[in-house]
Amino acid sequence: MFYHPVNGSIPIDRTTMDYVAFGIGEQPLILIPGLGEGMQTVKGTALPMALMYRSLAKDFRVYMFSRRTVMPETFSTAEMAEDLYYAMQQLGISSANVVGVSLGGMVVQHLAIQHPEAVKKLILCVTLPCPNDVLVDCLSRWIDMARINKFGSILTDTAIHSYTDSFLRKSLWFYKLFAGLYRTKHADRFITMAKAGIAHTALEGLANISCPTLIIGGRHDKIVTGEASEQLHSMIPNSELYLYEDYGHGLYEEAPDFWKRVKEFFI
């Protein structure tokens, strides 16, 4: 019932990439998380992830990859995509359904462009093709906070910019409590990943994405904007767009039908 959880790491350039795997299905499904993973990799989380995503674990073998643990000061989303492709090769995954959320969505755009054979179907969730003023403002603020180790403030600010008012009324107290206790050893890694988001662009290659693609966004997204999803849709041939009218950047946690929608697209 725990869906065969596995914690693993892949050696790469004198560091490692942590990953978890779980699920009893035959089809591989890859999930690439957003910037929050910059504070803490997925190391050791296979069992809780299997329980959290059990609706997917029944039909897929799910893989969630962190970026490399130690990064240079500058490391682009395109380079992260090359790391992901390398990790897939090391695990014998020739082709997979792929979901990228926020910064993870920027990474998998490059994966689909540079290695089309590796992506069977693609979901781009709350992400964008290139930076806009809203994203740059958020990431620049979080970089400034990270430089003085105010990661608790980053967590709280992210929640305020991600969730609906009704969700925040019920949950913000928890984020503030957790933020007061939160510590990370990965400040430099987080900053590198945030800078990669500011520098991201896939504009020249999006027209070459040939796999079936679903773009999911939130009309009230205060981090990448809902318009960014519409922009992606206009640039990726034959893509589908679903825009949640009542949610923002945290729609993948708030929208009750989100993972059902993901599952139906892949099946």
Go through the PLM ranges and name each one:
Residues 106-109, 113, 119-149, 189:
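Flexible "cap/lid" loop of the alpha/beta hydrolase fold
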Residues 133-136, 153-200, 204-205:
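Conserved alpha/beta-hydrolase catalytic His-Asp/Glu region
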Residues 209, 215-217, 221:
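Short beta-strand/loop motif that positions the catalytic acidic residue
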Residues 96, 100-105, 218:
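Conserved alpha/beta-hydrolase "nucleophile elbow" surrounding the catalytic nucleophile
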Residues 9-71:
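Conserved HGGG/HGGXW glycine-rich cap/lid loop of the alpha/beta-hydrolase fold
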Residues 79-96:
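Conserved acidic catalytic loop of the alpha/beta-hydrolase fold
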Residues 222-228:
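Conserved alpha/beta-hydrolase "acid-adjacent" motif
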Residues 247-259:
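Catalytic histidine-centered segment of alpha/beta-hydrolase-like enzymes
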